[in-house]
Amino acid sequence: MKKIIIVSIAKEKKIKDFRLVITPSGRSRIGAIQTKDYGIIAYPDKKDFEKIGEMINWAFNESDDKVIEYSSDIKIEKRFYNCNSYRKVTNDYNMIFFELIEGIYSISLLKKDGDAFVALEDENKEAVECIFPEKPTALELGTKVMEMFEYKERYDGLIE
C-alpha cells in the first residue's frame, strides 16, 4: 500500500471571524483514508500564516496509516462544523488537502461538486495545486494555504 497522508483544511466562506477546521487522517478497516475523530477548530487572524501552518503541521504529525479501530458515531458535519448535513458543509466551507504521497508534499484546492469536494481546475483545466520540493515550513504552508483560499473566494465572487 502506498504511503499517503492527507490533512483536511476547511475554511468557512467568510472574510472576517471565519472558522478553520483542520483534521488529521488515518485508515478505515478496509484501508481507505478516513478522518480521525479529533482535530483543530480555530478562529485565527487570516494574516497569522505561521500559526495556521503550525496547526496544519500538528494535524500532519497526527496523521498516519494506522487503522482507526474506534470511530465516533457522531457525523463529521456535526462533530467539526456544527452543521446538520454534509451538504451544508460543502455550501458553507472551502476545502484544501495537504498531502504527502510517496514523498511528494502538495496542497490541492477543492471545489463543491454536488454533495462532495473535488479538485478545482483553472482556466487551462489544470488542478489548482502547489507542489513543494520538500516539507514546507509552517510559514510557507500557512501562507500558501491562505493564498489558495483567497484565490477560491475570488473565483466564487466573495471578494474582488
Model-assigned labels for residue ranges:
Residues M1-K47, I101-T143:
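Intrinsically disordered, low-complexity regulatory segments enriched in Ser/Thr/Pro
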Residues F18, F49, F60, F80, ...:
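Phenylalanine-focused residue identity feature
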Residues R19, R27-R29, R79, R87, ...:
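Arginine residue identity/basic-tract feature
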Residues V21, V89, I96, S108, ...:
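Generic signature of intrinsically disordered, low-complexity segments enriched in small/polar residues
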Residues A42-N94:
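Negatively charged, low-complexity tracts enriched in Asp/Glu with abundant Ser/Thr
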Residues Y43-K66, N124-E160:
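Ampiphathic alpha-helical segments that act as solvent-exposed interaction surfaces
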Residues D73-V118, D122:
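Short, solvent-exposed interaction modules
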